[in-house]
Amino acid sequence: AEARDKPKGYHIDYANPARMTIPQTNFRMGYFINDHYNISIGLDHMKYVFKQNQIANVSGYVNLPASDAGSIYNGTYDNTPIDFFIIFNPDNDNNPPPFLTFEHTDGLNYINTEISRMDDISSKLFKSWNSDKIQINVTEGLGAGILLPKTNTRLLGKDRYDEFHVSGYGISAKAGLNITFFKHFFIQTELKGGYIEMNNIRTTENKADKAEQNFWFLQRIITVGGI
C-alpha cells in the first residue's frame, strides 16, 4: 500500500510555540563532549499518511460476527485487490465502513539519541578567516531510538483507535553543514536518512490487534539553535 509524509512548506507555524508540533518538526538538545564530538537526544516529529484513494492487494482471512459492520469484508483474501476509497458516514447505513484508514499524523515520533562529529572548515579554507564571528563546520552523525506514534486507525468498521504507543525502533545517519555566529548561535542544514521497524502498532482498542510495517526515510532539515 502507498503512503506519504505531510509536508507544510515554509509556514508561520514553525515559529509559533503553540503550533510548531502541527507541521513536521524536529527538536534536539545535546552536550559537546569536546570540540569535535557531541551527544544529543531529540524528537523527529515526522508524519505518515496512508493514501486512501488507492487499490491495494490484500492477503489473509476475515471472519467477523455478522452483527459487526466490518463483516461485509468476511472472506479469504489471496493477493486480492481492495478499493480503499470509500467515503464513510457513520450516520448513513448505506455507506459501509472502509476496510482500513491508517495514519501517523500526530507524529511517527522518532525519539532518538545521536552521536555526532563537527569539524571547522572555515579556518582551513580561508587562512585569515575570523571564526570567532562566523564559523563554518561540517557535521555527521549516527543515531538510534524508539517510535512513539499516535496512530489514527480504523480497521474493518471497529472503533477508531488514536493513542500514543511504543511501536518499534529506528536507526539513522546524517550529514550536514553548520554555520555558527559569534560562537553562540547557529543555522544548520542536514540530510538525514534511516530505517524504521514498527512491529507493534495498535490498530483497535483490543490489545491483541496489531499491525507491522517497515520503511526507509529521508529528511531535509533546516535547524536554528544556540550553544
Each predicted region: which residue ranges?
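Outer-membrane beta-barrel domain signature
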Residues: I12-D13, T25-N26, D44-K51, I55-N57, ...
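Extended, basic/helix-rich recognition subdomains
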Residues: D119, D132-N137, L147-T153, G157, ...
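Residues that define the transmembrane beta-barrel architecture of outer-membrane proteins
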Residues: T21-T25, T105-I111, I136, H165-I171, ...
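Predominantly the C-terminal beta-signal and adjacent terminal strand-loop region
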Residues: G176-I227
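Flexible, solvent-exposed coil segments and beta strand-coil junctions
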Residues: A3-Y10, I87-P97, K150-K158, T203-N206
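Extracellular loop and loop/strand-boundary signature of outer-membrane beta-barrel proteins
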Residues: I12-A15, P97-E103, L155-F164, E205-N214
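Surface-exposed strand-loop-strand hairpins of Gram-negative outer-membrane beta-barrel proteins
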Residues: A1-T21, V166
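Gram-negative (and chloroplast) outer-membrane scaffold detector with strong preference
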Residues: R28-T153, G225
